[in-house]
């Protein structure tokens, strides 16, 4: 539909609406979401909160006394107040949680968890009795409404006992409390799953909290009688948009706090009447006219309303048309300008191919010519009859102007890169609404196909010298990207399927679709976490900050793959138990048997000292603490025997940042495919 036709439709719709005698109603949106189990999507994790097997943990899971606090928040703010109708929303939520003490000593219990509503989505509260809700140094900074599930008696906050629920408003001194053990025989820290329902009805100014042990077989029934019922007007506190979530804490205890599922909804926004011919006031039940009005005949009323509609609509519609025309014209001009600028950048040193030439060379982009799939499109084998050469052509999946501009921007990175261990860009084409990039052809394909094809055929295509050469070549490419380019290039997607092998089995790093440019010695910016599970550094998953250290982690996983002939995440043939490659090699290292990790297909034909060095470099690069990982320049020096490697601890260290994720937690989400993108705050 053309723009002019769209504007006409808008125009006549507007006229029809204005000519009707009834006023128009507009309603505010109510919110509704449900998590039957959790993923990292749509949630923000602060402090020690973490995700394991679809369950949110709020505090560290340690068998020794520890101090911890964590918060998980629904990413999107929720509207609780509608200024047009001056209405505060009602809300209902229910969730299942478990509180369990890992130590049988009852003195090591505490402190509990809370469901909260707050304007703040980035402050981590203090541990202990503060329940991760507020900072002990600034207790009045964070305003909130919360239902606490307290498992420790804290006289500082006037707690009645060590097993109670309470309503907290801007303070941890509860307005009202109830002991579920006395009224419902529910022990909050029993280790059993408990389901809670929290209902606030704004029209009744009433908040009810229900509690029941979760039924493991059938749907848990909501109790008829609330455990806590408070007559309170929350409208002064539920103003504007707020965030909802959970927090939990410990202080010198071994208590864990798990959230298993969660649903939340708002309701009760009243409809708002738009302005009509007559002034009126909106109440809960009726409309009262300020002055008596003589109602004209139906025909006169219709003509009168139509005249008003035309008088109002015509000037507005003209302005709207001019605005829309100007907006799209400016947008088109900016995209064309940006594309021309990027096109000029790419022209330097590169050949511009015609679309017809590439179409013919790939047999019309026939599926039989597909040799790979990258972050932004399919890769085709192209045979140029006139020159007798073979190239690889990448075809972008993004057909929009924005998509092509973004793709050109990404490729401007690799267009200026020159290194023997990088796949070289030969040329490009931008015709018929498509963006095509031409790379040198790698006859031996990708590393993963060679590495894992062997296990099926029994033939070993990669001997020890090839594998060592691949590790050194990849380190050389990354050292160039991280330290020798004018701007530092962080690849963000290093994996065996993105490492190509030339005719002599030399490693060539390709697919820069996720790469980012940064200034040297500048702090990186958090972005969408992107890449492939099993290769992602733990701090990258947690904070979304990609650096040369996250690339180093991926490199460590890759060279362990090369040395061991095993995938990053694999299953034992007999038990079908998931095995993490880094953890497996580290366990063998701790037992003094690290060489037992070597690919059996090599049949012992390798340099033991150098192989051990390669395995230990892999572990050092995959160290959970990013500060302990060597730079790629140092890795290259170690593998070239120019310097000695630094020692690798016998036991795999725990993560040093505040989130309590283990590497198993990080990779356990990879059930449906290779590449996963998460939104991380």
UniProtKB/Swiss-Prot annotation:
Active-site annotation: 493
Catalytic reactions on record: L-seryl-[protein] + ATP = O-phospho-L-seryl-[protein] + ADP + H(+); L-threonyl-[protein] + ATP = O-phospho-L-threonyl-[protein] + ADP + H(+)
Domain of life: Eukaryota
Listed transmembrane segments: 306-326
Side Cytoplasmic, residues: 327-681
Domain Protein kinase as annotated: residue spans: 365-643
Amino acids binding ATP: 371-379, 394
Extracellular side: 22-305
Function: Involved in resistance response to the pathogenic oomycetes Phytophthora infestans and Phytophthora capsici.
Protein name according to UniProt: Probable L-type lectin-domain containing receptor kinase S.7
Organism per entry: Arabidopsis thaliana (Mouse-ear cress)
